[in-house]
Amino acid sequence: MSDIIKLTHVRKEYDDGFVALKDINLTIESGKFYSLLGPSGSGKTTILRIIAGFSEPTSGQVFFAGKDITNLDAAKRKINTVFQNYALFPHMNVFENVAFGLQIKKKDKQEIKLAVKEALHMVQLDGFANREISELSGGQQQRVAIARAIVNQPKVLLLDESLSALDKRLRKDMQFELREIQKKLGITFIFVTHDQEEALAMSDEIFVLNEGKIQQSGSPVDIYDEPVNDFVARFIGDSNILSGRMIKDYEVEFGNHRFECADAGIKPGEKVEVVLRPEDLDITDIEHGKLRVMVESQLFLGDHFEIKAIDSDENEWLIHSTNPTNIGKEVGVYFDPEDIHVMRFGESEAEFDKRLEAYEGDE
């Protein structure tokens, strides 16, 4: 796939001295679903606004299909945005809202009618053309906003926290629908969110941001299974993170025990952090466990039990299990070498990728 959006060395500093973006470099390929994921103030919405043309970078360049659009007006970019509050016109009905952009462009009336009908069909709102905006649910208003954006046939669609106002059930439904719409249209979606589950569920690629920097980028599986640092490991899903020490390639020490692992390329004796995901830990009898822990609490969350336990060194453990246990009971915890992920302090994403490629190539 060809690159459609590229940001090179983009920095955004405001008049009060606050730096929202620090040397952002990212590439967006055509036809994929991307998420910009991070906490409040991480810079994700600032990136979206710079891509849309609503804000100019202090330095750096923005490219669209190889052309420098850094200083190009937002109206001249082949990019549309769906805002968090949908920005629908309450005095217009559904048809008029969706048709608005085409009418501004002075398109033929019959052409507008057909385009609006097709856009509403795409978002499953057939028969809603004459409805008033006030008569629609939050999910239906979301669909109207998307229809209004896609009717203009943009090359890129930007979505700014556009599911955050919906309830949990409707949000999950819309995640599926957005993904299906993107696949049908074949255009690039860039979705801004602070919700890890949304990003993991919908995206082909994720950019994880914090404090104005891209912490890690990659597929949802890669980012979840191979977090590059402590922030990513904690922000993307639940994690058990312990201090450790590398013994040698494929062997690490933590919790006063040595374990076989799947990591290499780290100096023997180097201090590291070790990540174990709660769902990768199995409760077993003490004899078959690699660790011995005491169960402190247990919550039933519908599809699993969330168990909190503590070992003899007072390390706290979070375990997700489909089977309950007893509070106060000593149990064994089992995990495979591949379940251990070792992180180096201060290792950049580029350094991490290089190390990973080196030892995977030796296997």
From Swiss-Prot:
Its EC number is 7.6.2.11. PANTHER family: SPERMIDINE/PUTRESCINE IMPORT ATP-BINDING PROTEIN POTA, SPERMIDINE_PUTRESCINE IMPORT ATP-BINDING PROTEIN POTA. NCBIfam families: potA. The gene is potA. It comes from Lactobacillus gasseri (strain ATCC 33323 / DSM 20243 / BCRC 14619 / CIP 102991 / JCM 1131 / KCTC 3163 / NCIMB 11718 / NCTC 13722 / AM63). The complex is composed of two ATP-binding proteins (PotA), two transmembrane proteins (PotB and PotC) and a solute-binding protein (PotD). This is Spermidine/putrescine import ATP-binding protein PotA. It is a peripheral membrane protein. The keyword Membrane applies. One of its GO terms (cellular component) is ATP-binding cassette (ABC) transporter complex. It holds the Pfam family TOBE_2.
